[in-house]
Each structure stands twice: as structure tokens, then as C-alpha cells.
Regions:
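Functionally constrained cores in energy, signaling, and assembly domains
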Residues: 16-17, 61, 70, 86, ...
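Domain-terminus/edge residues, biased toward the C-terminal soluble/receptor-binding domains
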Residues: 189, 202-204, 210, 215-407
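Hydrophobic membrane-insertion alpha-helices, especially the h-region
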Residues: 16-33
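Active-site-adjacent loops and short helices of periplasmic peptidoglycan-processing enzymes
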Residues: 2, 6-12, 36-209, 216-222
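Intrinsically disordered, low-complexity regions
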Residues: 31, 49, 61, 186, ...
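Low-complexity, intrinsically disordered regions enriched in charged/polar residues
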Residues: 9, 25-28, 46, 316-319, ...
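Short acidic/polar alpha-helix capping motifs at helix-coil junctions
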Residues: 17, 126-129, 146, 232, ...
Length: 407
């Protein structure tokens, strides 16, 4: 076949263009591969979910309306078959004290600010007393510290002290009740509604699970825990006032609050300190000839049934390998470690599950002990999170690593 010079030149030119484009394409591809981001490192969990052998057994008393039992450390273990809203009566004062101590913290031994009793508060005392409410005597001009007001609120259960504290904290009782409801909402107490700071209103209602959760938080405040464990208090005008919680000291009960009214019957939130375990329970609507005595006796029964089934177990040890990290440019898997110990109260049948989440943006190089993720432990009714750390240095990809990626 005959080709003229123009044909040969055109073919040579086209080949040259093709080769140039091929080289440019390769350079572009290589550059892209060298500098594009790497796939995200993968964290993998090696911990296995577990369940404590056996089953938790409890017989709920038949003379209460609603109840829950559990521990301060690991949450609710058992509930009565039915649950619902119920008038709180003086159990409402747990929230009142909780808010006061959050807004005006007191260390154990501190008295806090001093308040002066007004004529309005004397009149309020007289009106509440006439109405048959639980009150503590006050006098015009009497000086009461924040601590004394909290002691009068939680020990002899003074409704009038709840109103004094409410006005001091929020400016008015209405504003304080609004704060109670907002606090309940922020804590996830979905079935709780407050109409007053003392619980005298039948419209102040909650459920045992909600009050269990609130008391878990309140009992972590040292001053709250100290006050509810006191058998009596000596106040300036009223003198010695005794705790309405007659279970104090029995079966190591260290608090927390009783509540009685015609609509409520008797309610009792209690904490029994068994070694390093706090058994926490809530009883609503105890009945019988003496409902409060029923509630107090049932609490002891529940503690006795519960305490033999509890133990403390270490679930995680500091520096324990809980999984590994896979890095695309490294062939080996790098162990990842727990940053702390974690122990909790366990019971028969308790389920324990683990989940692992990486930090949002892992940046290299990673130093030894650098936080690269979060381990979430779900145990019974509770959740705990801890940082997860790298066991060794993990270098950023080198130029050679990137170059290998091209080929």
C-alpha cells in the first residue's frame, strides 16, 4: 500500500499526541493518588457482650400501688407490673432540695446565706398548720440559714420551709415551680409535673422510675446525702425536730424521703447502704391502717430480698485491650486500650453490652495514649462512657506509602 509523506506525518503526529496525553493522564492520576485522602481508619471491638448468670427474683408487696428497686450505681433492676403517675406528697421536696443545692451549693459544714423570716412567712405557717399540712414553727424576724432551711425541709418535712426556699431562690413560688418543671424536663423526667414546691397539691405527680432517676442525682450531692441521713435537727424557734423517716439506721437505711397525704397514701424513697452498694427504692401508694408504717416496713422487706442478689464486678481494667485499629498503610492491627478501670454493681440476669465509636476526625501521627475513640458500656438500666487510647505511636503515611498506592 502506498503512503504519501502527508499521511506518514499525520500518523506520527497523532501518535505523539496520544503518547503525550497518556503521560499527562498518568502524571495526573499519580498526583491524585499521592495526595488524595486515605480511607478512614477502622476501629474494631474485641469485647463480647455478656449476661450475668441466673435471674433476679423479687416478690413485690401487694399493699403498694407502684414501685421500683435498683441500685444507685447501676439503675433500676425491677418494677411493679403496673406503673403510672401518682401524687408525690412530700417526696416532691427531693426536687426542691436538689434545685436549691444546684443553685446555691453547700459543702458539708457550710451554713450558707442567712434568711430572715417575714410576716408573710409567719402567716403562711399558720395557714398551712390550720390546713393540716406538715409544718415547722417560725417567728417574725427569726434567722435561718440555707442549711437549716434544707434540714427543716428534708427532716421534719416542713411545707412552709419549701415556700421560703422557693421565694429565696426564684423570687416567687410560681417562678420556682416553673424551674422545677424545666429541671424535670431537662433531666428526662417525662412523667413528672410539679404544681407546688412542697407536694401538698395532688396535682404534683410523678412515677417511681422518674423519682428513682432524680434521687440517683440528688444522692451524689454530699450535702443532700448528709442531711437526709440525719435523725433530727435543732432549729432556733421550733427546737428539736425528728426525721419522719423512722427506717433510718435499720438495715443500713441512710435516707431519703417519705411523703404522705390522703390522695397519695404513703410514699417512700429509700437508700440502704450495703457496703459499697446503695440499694435505691421507690414506693408509691402504700395502704393499710397506717400507710406510712406500711411503706417503711415494705422498704425493709425489699432491701432484704435484694441485697443477697447483688455483687460488685470489674468490667474493664485500665490498659486492657478492648479492640484494635486498622490503618490502610500499615499491614498490622494496632491494639487500642481502655483508659481507666470500670466496676459496677451487677445482679443475676443483668445484660452488659459494649459499643465503640471513633473520634470525629482522627489525625496522624497518633501519639501513644492519645484518645482515638469512646467505649460505651450499657449495663442494666445505666450507661457509662470512657475514652479509648492508642497503645503505640501510629505514623502518618510516608511519601513511599503514597507512592506504593499509585502502583
Amino acid at each position: 500500500m502506498y503512503y504519501n509523506e502527508d499521511d506518514r506525518y499525520a500518523k506520527h503526529k497523532n501518535l505523539k499526541r496520544f503518547l503525550v496525553l497518556l503521560v499527562l493522564g498518568f502524571i495526573f492520576y499519580a498526583g491524585f493518588q499521592l495526595f488524595k485522602g486515605w480511607p478512614k481508619p477502622q476501629l474494631e471491638l474485641s469485647l463480647k457482650d455478656q449476661q450475668i448468670p441466673g435471674s433476679f427474683n423479687i416478690s413485690w408487696p401487694t399493699d403498694i400501688r407502684y414501685g421500683v428497686i435498683g441500685t444507685l450505681q447501676s439503675g433500676i433492676i425491677s418494677k411493679t407490673p403496673n406503673q403510672g403517675q401518682w401524687p408525690l406528697a412530700s417526696v416532691a421536696k427531693i426536687m426542691t432540695a436538689y434545685i436549691i443545692l444546684k443553685d446555691h451549693p453547700l459543702s458539708i459544714g457550710q451554713d450558707g446565706p442567712t434568711l430572715t423570716v417575714t410576716q408573710k412567712e409567719v402567716n403562711e405557717y399558720e395557714a398551712f398548720k390550720k390546713d393540716g399540712q406538715s409544718v415547722v414553727k417560725v417567728a417574725l424576724g427569726e434567722k435561718l440559714t440555707e442549711r437549716q432551711l434544707l434540714e427543716g425541709l428534708m427532716i421534719p418535712s416542713a411545707n412552709n420551709f419549701a415556700y421560703i426556699l422557693a421565694r429565696w431562690d426564684a423570687g416567687s413560688v410560681k417562678a420556682f415551680v416553673d424551674k422545677m418543671n424545666k429541671t424535670a424536663q431537662s433531666l428526662g423526667l417525662k412523667d413528672t409535673r410539679y404544681e407546688d414546691p412542697s407536694g401538698a397539691s395532688a396535682g404534683t405527680v410523678s412515677t417511681p422510675p422518674d423519682q428513682f432517676k432524680l434521687t440517683q442525682l440528688a444522692m451524689q450531692i454530699p450535702t443532700f446525702r448528709h442531711i437526709v441521713a440525719m435523725p433530727q435537727v435543732n432549729l432556733p424557734i421550733a427546737g428539736i425536730q425528728y426525721n419522719v423517716n423512722y427506717d433510718l439506721g435499720k438495715d443500713n437505711i441512710v435516707g431519703v424521703k417519705t411523703g404522705s397525704s390522703l390522695p397519695a397514701g404513703a410514699n417512700f424513697v429509700f437508700d440502704s447502704k450495703q457496703g459499697n452498694i446503695d440499694i435505691l427504692g421507690v414506693i408509691f401508694g402504700a395502704s393499710g391502717k397506717s400507710p406510712l408504717i406500711t411503706a417503711l416496713k415494705d422498704a425493709i422487706t425489699l432491701v432484704d430480698m435484694t441485697k443477697t442478689q447483688l455483687s460488685t464486678k470489674k468490667l474493664i481494667s485500665k490498659n486492657q485491650q478492648i479492640g484494635f485499629i486498622k490503618v490502610p498503610w500499615m499491614k498490622k492491627e494496632i491494639p487500642i486500650l481502655a483508659s481507666q478501670d470500670f466496676s459496677t454493681v451487677v445482679y443475676p440476669g443483668m445484660k452488659i453490652t459494649y459499643s465503640l465509636y471513633p473520634v470525629k476526625d482522627i489525625k496522624f501521627p497518633i501519639k501513644p495514649n492519645e484518645v482515638i475513640g469512646t467505649l460505651v458500656i450499657n449495663y442494666g438500666d445505666s450507661t457509662y462512657s470512657m475514652p479509648i487510647i492508642a497503645s503505640q505511636e501510629i505514623e502518618a503515611p510516608s511519601f513511599l506509602d503514597r507512592l506504593r498506592r499509585v502502583f
